[in-house]
Amino acid sequence: MKNLKMSIAAMLLLAVSFTNAQEKEKMNHDHGDMKMDHSKMKMDQMQDAKAEAVLADYFTLKDALVGDDTKKAAQSGTKLVASLKSFDKSSYTKEQQEELVDIIDDATEHAEHIVKSAIDHQREHFKTLSKDITDMVSITGTKNTLYEQFCPMYDKGSAWLSASNEVRNPYYGSKMLKCGKVQKTIQ
């Protein structure tokens, strides 16, 4: 008899919970006809694309320095200058815009020096450029995982960003290709 009462109670409990689940489902609203303003979303996507274009050009420049290719580094510097100059800051707060103006102006100056210089001088400017791009990413964010890598030997220690956690040193290139370590992961 006790088992029968327990079975009936369990069935009653199941029936009540099933009824509640059906009622909750009826409460879900259909938003199919609702109009949404996607302009902000499109702006954010365009902004992400501009930030990612700057990063892509930066990585191309880094890879040219890793490969000891002065000419390709100069060409990459030219592309990076264009990406930096076309970067739209309008979707950021006033404070962020002011910071971005300073960062982008400085980064542009160093990228322009890279365009006109021999590889040793390109690497000197790449150090400051890397700091600028890292500062920019701290404001803009990124959709990809980045790795801040560090070489303790170049100019008393120098960092750069990479899309790979595998260390490829742009400051020494083939001389010390794997000198360095990942010091931070940026997501």
Predicted regions, residues:
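Intrinsically disordered, low-complexity terminal tails/loops enriched in metal-binding residues
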Residues: 2-7, 17-187
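Hydrophobic core
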Residues: 12-16
